[in-house]
Amino acid sequence: MNRYKLKDLSLNKLEYGSGAAACEYDGSTRYVRITDIDNEGNLGEDVVSPNTVDDKYLLNDGDVLFARTGATVGKTYLYRASAGRCIYAGFLIRVVPNQELIRPDYLYYFTKSPQYKGFVQSSMKVVAQPNINAKQYGDLEFNVPSLSEQDSIIEKLKAVSTVIALRKTELLKLDELIKARFVELFSEYEWSTTIGNYIAELRGGKSLAGTEPCKNKVLKTGAATFGWFDPEQYKFLPQDYEPLQEHKVETGDVMISRMNTPELVGACSYVFEAPENMYYPDRLWKVITKNNANPIFIWQLLWDPEIRRQIKEKSGGTSGTMHNISKPKLLEIKCIDVPVTVQNDFADFVKQVDKSKVVVQNALKKADILFDSLMQTYFR
């Protein structure tokens, strides 16, 4: 086992990418930017080209890119030739692994380790936004085992990563099944009513944050952001504050984010199982439905593309990054008029799909725990 600095593992000096502007994809050269790399280390579907192509920034199979600035500083991408001809942008730094010392996959997996994450947190220079420069990355020092041991580690981590990816794909397919069923059942109904026809009240909570652990917790906006309730998105309430019962999160609730980014304002989720002692903040509304509405139907209705378009159109704000929507504007949004009996049939279908999701989520959780355990073992 040897110890190296990152700069000593790269065949080239750690280099910033191209300063070219992005333009429409030319069918030949893709421009890889920070925003194109997702949390799984994959490239997104928004394909663009650089307006000028300089071959010095062309990626070669096995190159590893490091994000040097912005909210995603520290994020990495392992380039493979199967991604096609690519040039990398200036907010990324390239490492060309010396494969006589380190496998590209091993370096990439290292960037998922607790040691690397600790380095990112301790190294960020925050001025207008977080930043880690090439020198800081180059001085990052870590243990590197023999190539044969690296190969063994890579094989095991890839096996678990494959299981994790499969489980995530299963969850996405189940989500798509619900969306497809919604379209199948409701596409023929008239857009002749408003959201207010289904909702009796939009009830906001109270946002307070304690400095110490407390049995009572308040949700963060992120609990509703991506369509599924995330009970891990919370803060502790002050120990001397007694929350109102009407602000409590309950099983069967629909919650709506009244303030978020322009794309996510109005995001909502459904609570299949409420955690104990959890309460609403003022940025999330608890939806009180009328007798003619099924909460699960309302949850899925609010994710309909046309509803999302109307919400975005009616929202606003003084900040370019945060928008909000008022209760009256949300309630006046046009929507389909569906009998509650049909809504209930759809809700029963969603509940059955959710049972399958729980099984997959539990399997995913076990795979995640195994992956984290292996990372702790291999990257000390």
Each predicted region: which residue ranges?
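Short, solvent-exposed loop/turn positions at domain surfaces
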Residues: 50-53, 126, 165, 243, ...
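Non-catalytic DNA-recognition/assembly elements of restriction-modification systems
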Residues: 1-16, 40, 139-154, 169-206, ...
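Short coil/turn segments at secondary-structure boundaries
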Residues: 20-26, 122-124, 208-215, 314-315
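Sequence-specific dsDNA recognition surfaces
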Residues: 4-20, 35-61, 197-208, 222-254
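A short glycine-rich beta-alpha junction/loop motif
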Residues: 85-93, 102-105, 125-148, 277-285, ...
